[in-house]
Regions:
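Proline- and acidic/polar-enriched loop/turn elements at helix boundaries
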Residues: 41, 48, 76-77, 110, ...
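Oxidoreductase cofactor-interface core, primarily capturing Rossmann-like NAD(P)-dependent enzymes
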Residues: 1-3, 22-24, 67, 81-177
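Short beta-strand segments at enzyme active-site cores
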Residues: 70-76
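Short glycine-centered, acidic/aromatic-flanked micro-motifs in structured strand/loop junctions
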Residues: 39, 77, 169-171
Length: 177
């Protein structure tokens, strides 16, 4: 568990690390006003995706409802717009559950992360394969930095224009192909 004080009156961020083998983290949820879930399966494989992208997020949602949490913010992914893979379907299933939960929510769908793309560039430099489709325009994206995404997520707490919405977000520059 890690606490961060933003220097704002009555505002504190508590990061809770979730463990599959230890449920003591559940007890730490009782005083939370806003849930921000950045959970995502590591492999994206069907079993992993169901357990994390749907079931674990759903457990958090049920806890949020039980303690009458004010808001639930979900970090999702832009790729769920045209789902083909198991993790995309699991994310969409949870998004639907969240939208119908009765809680105030924001669903954030970033286009891509600079960190992820830079890792792909390093792999290409090492001679590893990279697959793109057609002329590359189908996979173009406008990546966002971790800092910019974090600030956007936090802005969803107080910006009522971002409540009860699905919010695609990209970086400040032109799309990369």
């Amino acid at each position: 568990e890690e606490s961060v004080d933003f220097g704002l009156k009555h505002q504190k961020l508590t990061v809770i690390k979730i463990s599959e083998n230890d449920n003591s983290w559940v007890d730490k949820l009782k005083d939370i006003d806003v849930f921000i879930s950045c959970l995502a399966s590591r492999s994206g494989e069907p079993k992993d995706a169901h357990c994390v992208d749907f079931k674990l997020n759903n457990l958090l949602l049920e806890k949020a409802k039980a303690i009458e949490c004010a808001q639930f913010i979900l970090l999702s992914a832009i790729c769920v717009q045209k789902p083909k893979l198991a993790f995309q379907f699991e994310k969409l299933a949870f998004e639907e559950r969240l939208r119908n939960s009765g809680l105030n929510f924001s669903i954030i769908r970033p286009t891509a992360y600079f960190k992820s793309l830079s890792g792909q560039i390093e792999n290409i430099k090492k001679g590893k394969p990279y697959i793109y489709f057609g002329d590359g325009k189908l996979t173009q994206c406008n990546p966002i930095s971790e800092k910019d995404l974090s600030l956007f997520i936090l802005s969803c707490i107080s910006d009522k224009n971002k409540w009860k919405k699905i919010l695609p977000i990209g970086g400040p520059n032109q799309s990369l192909t």
